[in-house]
UniProtKB/Swiss-Prot annotation:
Forms a heterooligomeric complex that consists of seven subunits: MrpA, MrpB, MrpC, MrpD, MrpE, MrpF and MrpG. This is Na(+)/H(+) antiporter subunit A. One of its GO terms (cellular component) is plasma membrane. Mrp-dependent antiport apparently occurs by a secondary, proton motive force-dependent mechanism, but the similarity of several Mrp proteins to membrane-embedded subunits of energy-coupled NADH dehydrogenase complexes raises the possibility that there is a capacity for electron transport that could provide a primary energy coupling option for Mrp functions. The keyword Oxidoreductase does not apply.
């Protein structure tokens, strides 16, 4: 295992230590120990920027299941490194923030930081592995760990509901994505993303291209909360604020964006990719920003804001597909450039806003915007953080959000000039949707800021006396807003170090024989259409915010009964009721019914498959002749079996069943296997004795009258099982595709096992572990039975078995 693999697995390894630290180092907040790891990982990944800047990549393979082509392959390029730095950098700040947010006296810190480290490791695995099967494994780990984090306050019903909702939706999408990965494997015969990229022409011309693309997009859309799968994200706000700041601003919700960007070289050649990704993203942007305006909970506003911003980034990745048709000029690649830049910007301003909202909740006891107001003088630093964050989110200068929003407008305006995918007619919708979504973004940004910090202070509405947060809680958001300001004045620090290498990863096929991408971001381009669109947003957005009370009645046009949340709840209820009804039909409580299902399934599936494929064919060559003794013993065994079934007392049935076992021992004698014969005799004797001992204490056997249908069903099922098992045995012995392994045991029994008794050597040496674990299972079963017999329950001074 190399250092790269260890870097990804280190959060999981460190998570094992956390419970002990939380238990035995109670004087120190557990977060201080946890903080060390993301900081070290960030420092480890940071120097790799020079490598990706020069166009180099880093690849390391750890074999896992090489026979299936599934290996733990770490591949670091510009895109993966960008996400790794976001995961570890934001993770460090969130961990520092959580130290002051979560009380070591009131909260269970051990589980919280175990879940947080699990999530961090899973996210690193998603963005840094090359094998899609390993990627899927880490993908599902992000869903599992986020479920645990969202449900951290598990005593709250809303927390449990939100956690279950996120798990159900994201895991369903993950299963779809797994199906897409398998389809790609069927096309390319490889699980490696790099090898898939090199077989783009093969994939594009295959009939499974569209199904694979749709399945992978479903996985990405569910994880990145795109319409109509966004409904899990607002309910996930029941998680502690550090979780929201980490998962829902910079990491988990960006996993879908990563997948779309990573698979763009494979799918972006198609018109379907362009339309699906860009339109779903644009519609989600408008839908999320529109619904954010009506929210009254600060975290709900940020949740719908996140939905909108993610849609904005995804729409740009969809539009960037045009570059694969026109070439890698700046005119067509600006959308990808803007998507990457806004990905970074969103992590800064949204992370700071989540932390600011957490501070407000922590220091006032509420997030209800109707109870807040007048906090600007009381919490001036938090106000400054919120001002920079909201203005950047609204796309106003001098903050980084303004630059990426202008680039977003540029990419949408250029769509109208694409002679591609028949966008001439519908191309005008792209900048129109972008502008409408930005207007609502401006309105909810102003609402979040001014409704919270301006107006009248209402101490009677608050659970706590409002005051400024401690310094430790303020440091992480201050760092983030400082980045938001700095990146406006010095954006090209990112251009050359992170954005260009990431674009090289998104467009690897465009660089063959061409020079590298050159990204340069400027604050001023003169009076352009984009600037006029921004001015219009400010004017219309200000009017919309000031007149919000007059037009917010429009939200009543959307009945609560028709919302996606209500639809989700109804579908869940219908599935639960339906599954209960179906289960009630076959879960009768009778063991014979369950055996009937099993045996009927065996007959239909196994018997049907063999019959269709012609598996029931027999060869008589090489078979020994059937002797008189064998015929006699067979008749005795059949007679004893019939007697067992029709016996009128348990004693008779047990004796007849014993005859079957002893007859089998005689077969072993005839076939010259004395050890097996002796073993069978001993086992049969013990079994008969135990049966007699147990049944002696049971009431007398009462023969109940059974219906003809019941008896006929039992007869058909038992006859079918017997016939199929017999046919399978004969067919398998007469249709050997390879030589029998018996000769190997006979030949090497003495040399390798040190014994001449082949059967004993097989049991003790060749399959020694099987024998050992069989004994272990029997021992555990015996202990369980013994404990049941010896355990006595005392009730009212009496004891009973």
């Amino acid at each position: 295992m190399q250092l790269l693999h260890l870097a990804i697995l280190s959060p999981f390894l460190f998570a094992f230590i956390i419970p002990f630290l939380a238990k035995y180092a109670k004087r120190v907040h557990t977060g201080w120990f946890v903080l060390i790891l993301p900081v070290l990982l960030f420092i480890y990944f940071l120097p790799m920027i020079r490598m990706t800047q020069s166009g180099e990549t880093l690849r390391s393979v750890l074999e896992w299941i090489p026979s299936l082509g599934i290996n733990f392959t770490v591949y670091i390029d510009g895109l993966g490194l960008l996400f790794a730095l976001l995961i570890t950098g934001i993770g460090s700040l969130v961990t520092l923030y959580s130290i002051f947010y979560l009380s070591k006296e009131k909260e269970q810190l051990g589980p919280f930081y175990v879940y947080l480290l699990m999530f961090m490791g899973a996210m690193l695995g998603v963005v840094l592995v090359d094998n899609v099967m390993v990627l899927y494994m880490f993908w599902e780990l992000t869903s599992l760990s986020s479920f645990l984090l969202i449900g951290y306050w598990y005593k709250r019903e809303k927390s449990r509901y939100g956690a279950a909702k996120s798990l159900l939706i994201t895991v369903s999408g993950g299963l779809c994505m797994l199906g897409g990965f398998i389809l790609l494997y069927l096309i390319t015969d490889s699980f490696s993303i790099r090898e898939m990229v090199h077989q783009v022409q093969l994939i594009a011309g295959h009939e499974l291209f569209i199904p694979a693309m749709i399945l992978i997009l479903l996985g990405a859309f569910t994880k990145s909360a795109q319409f109509p799968f966004y409904i899990w994200l607002p309910d996930a706000m029941e998680a502690p604020t550090p979780v929201s700041a980490y998962l829902h601003s910079a990491t988990m919700v960006k996993a879908g964006i990563y997948v779309i960007a990573r698979f763009s070289p494979i799918f972006a050649f198609s018109a379907q990719w362009f339309w699906i990704v860009s339109l779903v993203g644009l519609f989600t942007m408008v839908w999320g920003s529109f619904h954010a305006v009506k929210q009254t909970d600060l975290k709900s506003i940020l949740a719908f804001s996140t939905v909108s911003q993610l849609g904005m980034i995804i729409s740009m990745l969809g539009v960037s597909a045009a570059a694969l048709h026109y070439g890698h000029t700046e005119y067509y690649t600006v959308a990808a450039m803007a998507a990457i830049f806004h990905l970074i910007n969103h992590a800064t301003f949204k992370g700071s806003l989540f932390m600011a909202v957490g501070i407000i909740d922590h220091e006032t006891g509420t997030r209800d915007i109707r109870k807040l107001g007048g906090l600007m003088a009381i919490m001036p630093i938090t106000f400054t953080i919120s001002l920079i964050g909201t203005f950047s989110m609204a796309g106003l200068p001098p903050f980084n959000g303004f630059l990426s929003k202008e680039m977003f407008f540029t990419s949408m305006l250029r769509v109208t000039h694409f002679d591609l995918f028949n966008v001439q007619t519908w191309g005008v919708l792209f900048p129109l949707f972008a502008w409408i979504g930005s207007v609502f973004t401006f309105i909810y940004s102003m609402k979040l800021l001014f409704k919270t910090f301006r107006g009248n202070y209402q101490p009677e509405q608050l659970e706590k006396q409002a005051h400024e947060a401690p310094v430790g809680m303020l440091v992480p958001p201050v760092i983030l807003v400082a980045l938001a300001v700095s990146l406006f004045f010095f954006p090209n620090i990112l251009s050359y170090s992170l954005i260009e290498p990431a674009m090289n990863s998104i467009y690897p096929t465009l660089l063959d024989g061409h020079e590298k991408f050159h990204v340069h971001i400027s604050q001023w381009h003169g009076v352009t259409t984009e600037l006029l669109m921004t001015a219009g947003i400010v004017v219309i957005g200000t009017i919309g915010y000031l007149s919000l009370n007059k037009w917010k009645g429009i939200y009543k046009l959307f009945p609560s009964k028709l919302t996606l949340n209500r639809l989700y709840d109804k579908l869940l209820t219908m599935m639960e009721k339906g599954s209960y009804r179906v289960t009630k039909q076959y879960m009768t409580g009778f063991l014979r019914d369950y055996l009937l299902y099993i045996f009927a399934g065996f007959i239909i599936l196994i018997g049907g498959a063999f019959a269709i494929k012609g598996g029931f064919s027999f060869k008589t060559e090489g078979m020994a002749k059937i002797g008189v003794y064998e015929i006699i013993l067979t008749l005795v065994m059949i007679s004893a079996t019939v007697a067992t079934v029709f016996a009128r007392s348990r004693l008779t049935a047990i004796i007849a069943l014993g005859v079957v076992g002893y007859t089998l021992a005689l077969f072993f004698v005839i076939f010259r296997a004395p050890d097996l014969a002796l073993t069978q005799l001993v086992i049969e004797t013990i079994s008969v004795a135990l049966f007699l001992l147990c049944f002696y204490h049971l009431p007398k056997l009462r023969l109940k009258t059974k219906t003809r249908t019941f008896r006929m069903t039992n007869f058909i099922i038992s006859l079918g099982v017997g016939v199929i098992v017999t046919l399978l045995g004969i067919a398998s012995s007469s249709q050997r595709t390879k030589d029998s392994i018996a000769s190997f045991f006979v030949k090497h029994s003495h040399d390798l096992g040190g014994g001449d008794n082949v059967v004993n050597v097989i049991l003790v040496d060749f399959r020694g572990f099987d024998t050992m674990f069989e004994i272990t299972v029997l021992t555990i079963a015996a202990l369980g039975i013994y404990s049941m017999i010896k355990t006595k329950v005392k009730e009212e001074g009496k004891s009973g078995e």
